[in-house]
Amino acid sequence: MTPEHLPTEQYEAQLAEKVVRLQTMMAPFAAPVPEVFRSPVSHYRMRAEFRLWHDGDDLYHIIFDQQTRSRIRVDSFPAASALINQLMTAMLEGVRNNPVLRQKLFQIDYLTTLSNQAVVSVLYHKKLDDAWREQAEALRDALRAQGLNVHLIGRATKTKIELDQDYIDERLPVGGREMIYRQVENSFTQPNAAMNIQMLEWALDVTKGATGDLLELYCGNGNFSLALARNFDRVLATEIAKPSVAAAQYNIAANHIDNVQIIRMAAEEFTQAMNGVRQFNRLQGIDLHSYQCETIFVDPPRSGLDSETEKMVQAYPRILYISCNPETLCRNLETLSQTHNVTRLALFDQFPYTHHMECGVLLTRK
């Protein structure tokens, strides 16, 4: 695979290899046959980051080869959304012959939605002044005149200039309802929107008929907790990043959801609070013990669950675990399988044509 060519004819074979690999990894835990969710074969990535290479009068996007670190020119990127591909061309056309916008420009980040909105961040090794803002506003207006619904952000050391806003609103059909998700520049969002819809609908399916409340750790912008709120009496969710918490609060209001409470704290801190080890001012007014959480949802970083959180989640009858790293999932399952059985398993092909796998498991207490 190269950045400008996807081996789409090999899609089914690469997916079959992942299925076999996941089944092998999960065999020690008596997991069921995985439910397999396919990605679109192209234009599936909703965000992308590129370095910029200045070559005389020419200017182009590059990425670095992960093995050799050699640079690879990228004029089109079929893994990314059609909107990103349009913007890649339009941005370079607008910047290439503009000294104010081009000088010291070293990176462009693109974030797009299925609702056809975009935030483009341009990163510089220089101070951004009024002249830059004037030229950037002219570029933004020119892009919009081409029918591109785009917001521009300038970044430099200790500087962030939003010409309008630093977010876009995604709209996803999930289980027969349209969900609105505010996505903030430079914050985590699911990269493959089509796969995200399938992940949300799978999570809805496996929690159908659930009783009691839901606890979610690492909730981000509320991606899962808001979609799952319809299946539970109440949802209590934690997240550490301020922009993500603010986006989650917006999303609660935008979706007219009244049974979700977001707490800004790390999973490790929440574990301490639940165990009575520490008290937190952020929890004033929230009676943790009034929640009857019979299901816990975790979507941890690649490092998986730490040992204390492992112990904490074992206290819940049902554990729903979304993993972007099956190796750390299996490490966690060595502990979790002592008290719980794996009753559902899913493979989500979030990153086609790569080694990476995303998977989901539902564990129920023995």
Curated annotation (Swiss-Prot):
- Enumerate the catalysed reactions: uridine(54) in tRNA + S-adenosyl-L-methionine = 5-methyluridine(54) in tRNA + S-adenosyl-L-homocysteine + H(+); uridine(341) in tmRNA + S-adenosyl-L-methionine = 5-methyluridine(341) in tmRNA + S-adenosyl-L-homocysteine + H(+)
Which Gene Ontology molecular-function terms are recorded? rRNA binding; tRNA (uracil(54)-C5)-methyltransferase activity, S-adenosyl methionine-dependent; tRNA binding
Check the record and name the SUPFAM superfamilies matching this protein. S-adenosyl-L-methionine-dependent methyltransferases
GO cellular component entries: cytosol
Q: What is its EC number?
A: 2.1.1.-, 2.1.1.35
One Pfam family hit = tRNA_U5-meth_tr
What InterPro entries does the annotation carry?
MeTrfase_TrmA_AS (IPR030390), MeTrfase_TrmA_CS (IPR030391), SAM-dependent_MTases_sf (IPR029063), TrmA_MeTrfase (IPR011869), U5_MeTrfase_fam (IPR010280)
Print the keywords alphabetically: Methyltransferase, S-adenosyl-L-methionine, Transferase, tRNA processing
- Sequence positions that bind S-adenosyl-L-methionine: 190, 218, 223, 239, 299
Q: Which residues form the active site?
A: 324, 358
Q: Which GO terms describe its biological process?
A: tRNA methylation
Q: Which Gene3D superfamilies match?
A: 2.40.50.1070, Vaccinia Virus protein VP39
- The organism's superkingdom is given as Bacteria
Task: Give the protein's function.
Answer: Dual-specificity methyltransferase that catalyzes the formation of 5-methyluridine at position 54 (m5U54) in all tRNAs, and that of position 341 (m5U341) in tmRNA (transfer-mRNA).
Q: Which family does it belong to?
A: Belongs to the class I-like SAM-binding methyltransferase superfamily. RNA M5U methyltransferase family. TrmA subfamily.
Please state what the protein is called: tRNA/tmRNA (uracil-C(5))-methyltransferase
The species this protein belongs to is Klebsiella pneumoniae subsp. pneumoniae (strain ATCC 700721 / MGH 78578)
Phylogenetic placement of the source organism = Bacteria, Pseudomonadati, Pseudomonadota, Gammaproteobacteria, Enterobacterales
